Regions:
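Catalytic, metal-anchored helix/loop core of enzyme active sites in primary metabolism
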Residues: 1-405
Length: 405
């Protein structure tokens, strides 16, 4: 029988590529549920092509348009974030691909885990925000979490067949983004258009900005801790501009395994769907005759502070990664609206880390409260920044930033 796939975020970059995988492997998979946040026209087109059992639009104001457009098809139509959380529990679903962007992916992922649905995890923010909670839930329910990020999929593939051999370190590769060789002066004047031009990968706007600022790599460091059970000091980032080696694992005997391939997200998506099998596919093949120059560099955390901030959050633990994620979501949205500078994003994130109340052992309600508080504070900091006030020079609130648990 064909596996029934629920794609949360089907109109985004990962979602559309997942549908390409389903189309190519139509004898193996079917799109059972498709969801989108706002892109109703794209969702309509996908629904008409793939004929899922159900579609969900998070923006309830788009429900009537979606319902009317699909009235001639036997497709169930729902709206609202609660509907997304509920649909993942459908007994017919075999795999849930969490391709939603940001914090919004947390609750649907939790519901899918409770329903014991295998998770193909593309929404890295779920583990960034609440990694310990998600890991505990997955362990107790016996729910597998299969990584879709190319770097974590690479590590996962490197670990296949190792039978628990101890890891010395995980080495995550980073392209370095479009500003790898820029000076601080040049970074200060980076525009939205420049930041949206990634040299190697085709991604959505938010993750492309995160890649340019190296926050994406910082999030991947946090994600790696929870996926592979390694300490922060066992996770190394190296800049590899060619994006051919997707990541590596070094074992305690010094041997290093690497996973290589063309920069194409369809491969890790398909591997998450098919694991432990590999399916024949038409993806572009790596031609080693063309790979004459594979280079590696140390990341510069002075110019790209977000990577250092992510490591700091991981070391501190508790709700600190949640604070970083919420502040980052706010500043990236502001940057895309031309309301804050490229370097100003790091200033706001760092200041939010020093202001928002720290919780050492958070529960789900603490993550919700942390996310809301951080977003409010980050918005206030952006407003101050727009008036010319140097956010980095503002005093921290020692009273608010206390260990509350």
């Amino acid at each position: 029988m064909k596996k029934q796939i629920a794609i949360l975020g089907s109109t985004g970059s990962i979602g559309t590529q997942a549908l390409q995988v389903i189309e190519e492997q139509s004898d193996q998979y079917e799109a059972y549920v498709l969801t989108a946040n706002n892109r109703v026209e794209e969702l309509i087109a996908q629904a008409r092509k793939f004929k899922p059992e159900a579609v969900v639009i998070a923006n309830e104001t788009k429900y009537a348009q979606l319902k009317e457009a699909l009235a001639d098809l036997p497709i169930k139509v729902y709206a609202g974030t609660d509907a997304i959380c509920q649909i993942v529990e459908d007994s017919e679903i075999d795999i849930v691909l969490t391709a939603m962007v940001g914090y919004a992916g947390l609750k649907p992922t939790m519901n899918a885990i409770r329903a014991r649905k295998p998770i193909a995890l593309a929404n890295k923010e779920t583990l960034v925000v609440a990694g310990e909670l998600i890991n505990d839930m997955a362990r107790l329910s016996g729910t597998p979490i299969l990584p879709v990020d190319s770097e974590h999929s690479a590590v996962f593939q490197c670990l296949a067949g190792e039978l628990g051999n101890p890891i010395e370190k995980v080495i995550l590769t980073a392209s370095g983004g479009p500003f790898r060789n820029c000076t601080m002066e040049q970074l200060a004047t980076v525009t939205k258009a420049q930041a949206l031009k990634h040299p190697n990968w085709d991604m959505g706007a938010k993750i492309t900005i995160d890649s340019a600022s190296m926050m994406n790599k910082g999030f991947e460091v946090i994600e790696a801790k929870w996926l592979f059970g390694v300490r922060p000091d066992q996770i190394e980032v190296v800049v590899h501009p060619q994006s051919i080696i997707h990541s590596m694992v070094q074992f305690e005997d010094g041997a290093v395994k690497a996973q290589l391939g063309m920069p194409d997200m369809r491969l890790p998506i398909q591997y998450a769907f098919s694991y432990p099998q590999r399916l024949k596919a038409s993806f572009p093949r790596l031609d080693f005759k063309m790979c004459t120059n594979l280079t590696f560099e140390q990341p510069d955390t002075t110019r790209f502070r977000n990577l250092a901030l992510a490591y700091e959050a991981l070391h501190k633990g508790g709700n600190m990664p949640c604070i970083v994620n919420a502040a980052n979501e706010v500043v990236v949205a502001a940057f895309l609206r031309d309301e804050i500078s490229f370097l100003g994003m790091s200033d706001v994130i760092e200041k939010a880390m020093s202001i928002v109340s720290f919780v050492a052992k958070p529960e789900y309600e603490d993550y919700v409260a942390t996310d809301a508080m951080t977003r409010r504070i980050a918005q206030e900091l952006i407003k101050l920044n727009s008036t010319g006030i140097r956010v980095s020079q503002l005093p921290s609130s020692s009273e608010e930033n206390k260990n509350s648990k």
